[in-house]
Amino acid sequence: MDVVGRGASDWLDHKEDYGFGQYPSDAASLLALVAHEKRAGPLAKLIRRPASRSSPFIDWVGTSMGGLIGMMLAARSNSPIRRLVLNDVGPFISWQALTRLRKLHARRTERFNDLNEVQEYLRDVCAEFGPLSDEQWAHVAQHSVHASEDGGYELAWDPAILSALRIKTRDRIAFGNEFLLGFDLWPTWNAVRCPTLVLRGSRSAVLSGATARRMRKSGPRAKIIDIEGVGHAPWLMSEDQIGIIRDFLLSPDDPI
């Protein structure tokens, strides 16, 4: 899923709408559509009905913000999420980590002449994500940009997201006067009931060891696995990382 303003998704006309007031709503609509099509088959495109308690379950794998969206959805009553995988994110993010993430996103190159320049840029800003092969870097570069009108490339990411962050976080996620206390979703976490796996980069500045340990003892009592030598956030492109997720999703254990 490409969240609005990113990847192949459209950019919002009203830039102030970027934020967690919009993202979970979009994701819930997508899940309802997917569940409906799985339930109704070929007729789904002709008959639109809201998802019900009998909707098929869906597994959610989310990195960073995608994990927060998944957590918010999994905390809802009658959530269709069967199993939840959070990649290097938890219900608490310190203000230092938030500031660091904002600065990282602000290191934005407006235009690239070719995909080699895209790769060079990504190898720099994404270095702590972990090692990739040349072929994987080429794949990441190709899917991180779109062609610009002048024949070059631009990041597939609306720069207005950063300017909207200050407004949205203050008004909707309590990053105003409470900013110094960090981003706190512990009540949401404690409402999650589905089996949950958390992958944590051992060098992560976003998901601290203390937060991960608390996640193991509260809410869905997540299974925590550290990915050694990696910061925020593991690529989930290596065979071992993919295998960890596959084994969790295919586990015969019944959901909580």
Annotate each PLM feature.
Residues 113-170:
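Conserved alpha/beta-hydrolase catalytic His-Asp/Glu region
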Residues 230-239:
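Catalytic histidine-centered segment of alpha/beta-hydrolase-like enzymes
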